């Protein structure tokens, strides 16, 4: 499930609500924050900030584990933050593509076997990378929050 919208329209709060409700219903849920601010899952894990996939790629190349990318949150909801490029360099959309590829490469979906993956995607940027979860078959439904 992809949730997208313009900034400050309540997308992350909606994603949080979906995660908690689906988790309470017994589903194994993973939320992937796809915003360079990397704050989508903060309310779920309560740690302030977590390492983003792109920070791990930049600082440790490929020398990190799946556990470094996935943080357990409220009720076992799995929290991931894609992160963004170095400010002023790179493309945030390309960063999302890299993060999703890295999760797949490290076996996130096979190991954790989520029933539902919620992608909290920034929707006010004209960039093909932000549509990656839908375009590449990572998600089968998308919702625009207005």
Model regions and ranges:
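Walker A (P-loop) phosphate-binding motif
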Residues: 1-29
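Conserved beta-strand/loop subsegment of P-loop NTPase cores
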Residues: 140-146
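Short glycine/serine/threonine-rich phosphate/pyrophosphate-binding segments
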Residues: 11-15, 38-41, 121-129
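N-terminal phosphate/diphosphate-binding loop that engages ATP/GTP or pyrophosphate donors
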Residues: 18-83
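Short glycine-centered, acidic/aromatic-flanked micro-motifs in structured strand/loop junctions
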Residues: 4-5, 82, 146
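Phosphate-binding/switch loop-helix module in NTP-utilizing enzymes
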Residues: 78-138
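Electropositive phosphate-/nucleotide-binding environments in soluble metabolic enzymes
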Residues: 8, 16, 34, 93-97
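Generic enzyme active-site microenvironment
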Residues: 31-33, 118, 145
């Amino acid at each position: 499930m992809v949730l997208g919208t313009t900034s400050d329209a309540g997308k992350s709060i909606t994603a949080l609500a979906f995660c908690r409700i689906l988790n309470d219903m017994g589903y194994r849920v993973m939320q992937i924050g796809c915003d360079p601010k990397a704050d989508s899952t903060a309310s779920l894990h309560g740690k302030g900030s977590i390492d983003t996939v792109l920070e791990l790629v930049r600082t440790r190349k490929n020398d990190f584990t799946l556990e470094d990318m996935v943080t357990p949150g409220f009720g076992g909801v799995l929290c991931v933050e894609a992160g963004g490029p170095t400010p002023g360099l790179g493309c945030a959309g390309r960063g999302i593509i890299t993060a999703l590829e890295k999760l797949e490469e490290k076996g996130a979906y096979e190991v954790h076997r989520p029933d539902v993956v919620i992608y909290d995607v920034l929707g006010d940027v004209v960039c093909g990378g932000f549509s990656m979860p839908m375009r590449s078959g990572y998600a089968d439904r998308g919702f625009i929050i207005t």
